[in-house]
């Protein structure tokens, strides 16, 4: 029966925080390049194996004291001009390769100015290989017999490795060998003589304590960082002679272990030093180098050669690789050849060389900044962010400084005096880098399998030569005594020999008997054990059959449950879809309901607003019609009273004519008396029934007029002679030709018992301004009429028959301005003699910005229907102003009215200003407030023309 393979114990997890307190500083080494000429001036001197001294060469600026400045810098070890590549490798790179084989990461990079020997240190020269070929040689010397077959390990795109079994690896090898031009071949090929001398290393170097129970695989990759872009030097791009494609840059990614790697980078599996260096040399030919003023082959990019060592333990039998991905250990050694920092004033770089130098210096400056921040965070406990992402170089090696691994730096310097300033900056950077500490890498975890399993099934020699057990037993017998017989008479040697042989024979026979006895006992025991095993096997087989039947039944039950589960899942899916449809319908209905509710609320609000508006309009209309009715009733009453008064006066005049005796014809007065005589006309009754307290007196004690005084009824006040007033009104006697001296106006009528009260009404006084005791002679017919109301206020009433004269505004100065004549299309052409004529005017039917921008004045012709049925034309004038926004605004300043009247219309007589008295506290209801307050006297601030007549009546609101 085949023994069951034991399960591999789980790999113990190692916490990263377990060794976080153990840190090692960055190892910085210094290598001094030999001078090109023996008599060349030198600025660097090696003091001992750890210290160099940098002194100012002749011709440079001295310090403040006038002396040359000498500075010493310490390193972990200093390599002079006579140091060989072997010595440098043993001290710097050998520990890194040893850690690589034991599953630890490492970083080695060279730093210095251009032409300081960095590439020579890393690559070497014919006959003297550098660090890179020596590292490869040491790796393959250590794992040469433990390497896995090709394609057992296969890289993926996630910075990890996959394991293939022997069969899959064999198929992969056959597939690659069947290709017309395989990239790698397992057959031995002749080494390229171009680099054959570089990899011929005479000194044999091998790592110690290599795990023999593991298999190893080596993968190499080669990239360069050019102008802060990453390019794969091993990428095979098909050559197109017509349109060659430029190399594509690669991107940086972070794997699950937070390690940075180049996505899509080519990793080649190598099996020997020659094959690995051949891959390196193929990529080295693609690297960008150029001839500068300081170096014939100057590196224009940073190159990174990665050596990835993959190891996996053997299974418990020691025959095949353990097919568990968790047991794979991947370690990486990065060999970096940094481009040299340079100054453009020395290299005289132009064009692309200048751009390359700028990018190189920028990346090196970023590396120095990262070191400064790391040093400050570690020394002072700060937590500043390290700017790794500012450069692809620092971002690629971020996990070495923040994670685990050993970091080594070789500072290459050229001791010639011309490189003094550059070497000074390099030394300062090296001094800062030595103070940066990196976490110590952890040891590789033990897999837990039995050591030495590789040689478990390997034969130790030929099968036919194996010694028997009896021979082994015989070898344990005591040695025979000496058998040399020197004397013929020797009788002791042979008896001793015979006795020893007999003892050995007896002992051998006894041991054979014991062996046979033990063998028979072991056979019996083995037979019993076989019987017991057989019985147990039969018992286990019966149980196994029962278990298999049970398992088959459970499988059937599982299949039934799976079918039921699928049916239920299908029903659940249908229900979920139905629920989704219902929920969607519900959401749509809810949205529609919300929309309808909002619409209903808006309608309700509009309805309430409309109801309130209608209520207000009804109330306003009701109040308006009530006022209008009251006003019309009052006007009708007043009209009737006036008619009664006129009839009463006519009756009185007729009565006076009838009753008066006939007298002689009066003598015609002279002109002088006519001038001094105050001619009065009959005053029409006031449109309102005035209070009986209103009287008019003549100032300075003058006598009343000679006309006979007539009295109204008992309910009215005394008045002047009605006959003279009527005759004067009928004869149209102008009253403004007679001067009138007015001293005062009685605000209240004095009621005295037994004295007849007479209301002396003088002709209406017209004038712009008057004073007490001064004669005022009106000069214009349209001057303001001044009256007194029952409250003692002065009323200024214009003469309605006077010609219209604009008193408020000055004469228009539009003669020199350009006008916009706005005549709407709805206006009608009037046949008046006086027509508005504006020269150089722009006539428009609709006001526009273009016309307003060209003119300074604006005139709008507006027509409306007057109260008498005639068309009234208003010319509304204004000034045009420019606004800040670039437009125009119009400020209206004046209105001119053009109106036609019929000359046959009867002139309405004015009512008398004297009205019957009303009780105290009673208010006048003859008209509304709007009509009473429509006329006022207004004087603007700063005006020198005196008060002016202004009409403030608002137009009646039309019915909606």
Curated annotation (Swiss-Prot):
Residue numbers carrying Phosphothreonine: 738, 927
Tissue expression notes: Widely expressed.
GO MF entries: ATP binding; ATP hydrolysis activity; microtubule binding; microtubule motor activity
Coiled-coil residues: 535-620
Gene Ontology CC terms: centralspindlin complex; centrosome; cytoplasm; cytosol; Flemming body; focal adhesion; kinesin complex; microtubule
Ranges of residues in domain Kinesin motor: 25-436
Motif (Nuclear localization signal) on chain: 7-11
Binding residues for ATP: 112-119
Main location per the UniProt record: nucleus
Cross-link (Glycyl lysine isopeptide (Lys-Gly) (interchain with G-Cter in SUMO2)): 571, 586, 624, 647, 662, 665, 741, 823, 854, 874, 877, 899, 956
Quaternary assembly: Heterotetramer of two molecules each of RACGAP1 and KIF23. Found in the centralspindlin complex. Interacts with RACGAP1; the interaction is direct. Interacts with ECT2 and PRC1. Interacts with ANXA11 during cytokinesis. Interacts with BIRC6/bruce and USP8/UBPY. Interacts with ARF6, forming heterodimers and heterotetramers.
Family label: Belongs to the TRAFAC class myosin-kinesin ATPase superfamily. Kinesin family.
Disorder noted: Anemia, congenital dyserythropoietic, 3A: An autosomal dominant blood disorder characterized by ineffective erythropoiesis, hemolytic anemia, macrocytosis in the peripheral blood, intravascular hemolysis, and giant multinucleated erythroblasts in the bone marrow.
Protein's name in the database: Kinesin-like protein KIF23
Annotated organism of origin: Homo sapiens
Gene this chain is encoded by: KIF23
